[in-house]
């Protein structure tokens, strides 16, 4: 067994070491349509909207923010009010550019919320990559808890929630 040929190496599928965020819209149109529709009108499905000028003025004032200010590009806010901010495949605010200067800002569609809100992946697991492919192939949905953990499902909800739900009152 010598070294692999260049052609053989190219044929091998590359599976990213770190999964990439895919967004809540990937859950819609699959087995989770009802969950997606319920999420869209839930508090998590509207977190980014709270950062806009004039939204939740009383709550912003209570935590010493300015209701007339736009917080939709503020990094401190985006880490909890979006999906995967500053992570692979995660939300990119308006004005985001890649190394070549190309605009890579996330698309925002009010009719089909996605990474600009707190989506499924923020609580359950990052869905892109090898993990998602394995889960999607098992259409029976009969995973044991250990299997779901192996593919990234989070069960320590108290720790997951407190990453964001510790904002001062």
Where are these regions (language model features)?
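Short beta-strand-alpha-helix junction that forms the catalytic/metal-binding core
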Residues: 119, 160-161
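Sequence context of c-type cytochrome heme-c attachment sites
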Residues: 6-117, 121-155
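Solenoidal tandem-repeat scaffolds enriched in leucines and small polar residues
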Residues: 161, 165-169
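C-terminal segment of classical bacterial N-terminal signal peptides
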Residues: 1-5
